[in-house]
Amino acid sequence: MPKIQSSIEIDGPIDKVFALARDIESFPEFMPDLKSVNIVERSEDGSRIVSEWVGIVKEFKTTLKWTEEDIWDDKARTCVFSLVKGDYSKYSGNWAFTDLGDKTRFDSEIEVEYDVPLVGALIKGIIAKKMKENVDNMLEAIKGRVEG
């Protein structure tokens, strides 16, 4: 599956946007496709987080579970994440936050693969489209939360 790239401009300062993006435990409160996010491990300085996620795929009446490791860089305003284990065959990516004065650009790049045995190309295409929608919806949800 190709890389999913998405970007959004948020009407809010970078400190506020970055802080909300780091608060992954709160995501299920405002992202309906997420059932839960639980922190399993956090480094003393908070730069490394291992978390368990449960997502909901309504179209297929199923849930996806995965554990990921996030490496946050406060200075560069980035997060690099990768799959530890879970339902995905491949899951990795990065988030970058760019200061635009009173606005922030949030760039997301994710490489994700979800192999379903005996599923045809049409269904895989639907899954790829759904994953792109989920990334876009996540960025929109963070934008909505920051802009209030």
Over which residues does each language-model region extend?
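Amphipathic alpha-helical hairpins
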Residues: 2, 8, 30-38, 43, ...
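Hydrophobic ligand-binding cavity/cleft-lining segments
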Residues: 1-48, 105-107
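Hydrophobic/aromatic beta-strand elements that line small-molecule binding cavities or substrate pockets
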Residues: 6-8, 37-39, 55, 65-72, ...
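Glycine-rich portal/gate segments that line the openings of hydrophobic small-molecule binding cavities
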Residues: 39-84, 137-148
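Intrinsic-disorder/low-complexity, polar/charged segments enriched in Ser/Thr/Lys/Arg/Asp/Glu/Gln
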Residues: 3-7, 48-50, 65-67, 78, ...
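Short loop segments at secondary-structure junctions
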Residues: 12-14, 75-76, 100-102
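Beta-strand/loop substructures that line and gate deep hydrophobic ligand-binding cavities in soluble
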Residues: 82-129, 133
